[in-house]
C-alpha cells in the first residue's frame, strides 16, 4: 500500500513535469478547428502506468498544483487547462529558479487560468495588426534598407503597451 502510494506520487509528478515541458504539443492553436491536436504519448497517463480505475484515486502531490492530494483526473484537468489551452505559457527553459517559480505560482492550479475578455482579445489583435501593417509599410517605403523587423516578436507589441500603461 505504501509502495503503491509512493509510486503514484512519483508518476503524478512525472506527468505534471511532462505537461510543463511538452504541453505545448497538445495546445489548442487552431482557431478554426481544422487540425486535430492529437495525443502525445508523453502526456498520456497510461504511459505512466495509470489505468482508468486509477483516475479517481487520491494521490499525494505535496502542494505541487496548489493541492496536497488530487486524483489523476484532477491533475490532468489542471495541467491541460494550464499548458494546452488557447493561451499557454512555457517557462521550463528559464534557468533562474526564482523566475520560473514566480511564473509557476501564478499559472498552475484551479482558478489561475489566463482568460481575456472579448474586448481584450480585440485590442491585442488590433495592436498586432497595426504592428504588422507598419512593418509592411516600412518594407515598401525603405526597400533594400537594412532594418530589424518583428518576425516572431509581434506578441511583444501588446505586452509592451500593457507594461507602459501599468508603469506610467
Kindly give the residue locations of the regions a language model identified:
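Extended, charge-enriched "interface" segments that sit outside catalytic cores
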Residues: 1-156, 164
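Glycine-rich phosphate/diphosphate-binding loops that line cofactor/substrate pockets in enzymes
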Residues: 160-168
Amino acid at each position: 500500500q505504501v509502495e503503491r502510494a509512493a509510486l503514484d506520487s512519483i508518476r503524478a509528478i512525472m506527468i505534471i513535469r511532462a505537461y510543463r515541458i511538452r504541453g505545448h504539443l497538445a495546445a489548442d492553436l487552431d482557431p478554426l478547428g481544422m487540425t486535430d491536436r492529437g495525443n502525445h504519448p508523453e502526456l498520456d497517463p497510461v504511459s505512466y502506468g495509470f489505468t482508468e480505475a486509477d483516475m479517481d484515486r487520491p494521490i499525494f502531490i505535496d502542494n505541487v498544483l496548489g493541492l496536497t492530494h488530487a486524483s489523476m483526473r484532477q491533475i490532468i484537468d489542471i495541467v491541460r487547462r494550464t499548458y494546452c489551452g488557447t493561451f499557454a505559457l512555457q517557462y521550463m527553459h528559464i534557468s533562474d529558479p526564482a523566475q520560473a517559480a514566480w511564473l509557476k505560482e501564478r499559472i498552475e492550479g484551479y482558478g489561475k487560468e489566463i482568460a481575456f475578455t472579448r474586448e481584450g482579445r480585440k485590442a491585442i489583435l488590433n495592436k498586432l495588426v497595426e504592428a504588422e501593417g507598419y512593418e509592411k509599410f516600412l518594407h515598401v517605403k525603405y526597400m533594400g534598407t537594412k532594418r530589424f523587423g518583428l518576425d516572431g516578436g509581434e506578441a511583444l507589441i501588446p505586452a509592451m503597451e500593457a507594461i507602459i500603461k501599468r508603469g506610467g
